[in-house]
């Protein structure tokens, strides 16, 4: 089992801009076809920043951040991309240095359908929408990958001794293995306020995302 925790208020601030009186993020505010996102990384600043407290009227000052590297992410139409035919329900594609992620964006959320030629068995919720302070929502468990592996590689990956042990001596080699990966994600908009960066000050929501991955 793997658990990942993320705080995403930086991403939301840069995607939505300073446009909120009371902060509500809908599908018209997040990325669309033709958008370009610039993702700057600071590799030199000491880890003196804190995520602060939960609640309303919070203030985060990250104005001392400096750009060490810059990544450019393009949001394009799935039509005409390498894996277009594998994602008939996708209406948005993210090109991150050639890595293509396919999404379906609706008024209730942004759903990830797969990455490259890895098509998810079920779409995974990437962002719930609309986002408002106090939102708590759970997605899953979602079966992301459910496939069978066969061939000579399997014999190398699973030694005969392991097969004998797992089968109580009924078999001495594996000819097929099933791989299943499931994700459960908890979303919580637990803070709201202003965020200051070298680009300016923005009204933001802070989205906490906890993802638990199980594989068998």
What are these regions (language model features)?
Residues 1-24:
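Bacterial Sec-dependent N-terminal signal peptides
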Residues 22-216:
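Conserved functional acidic sites
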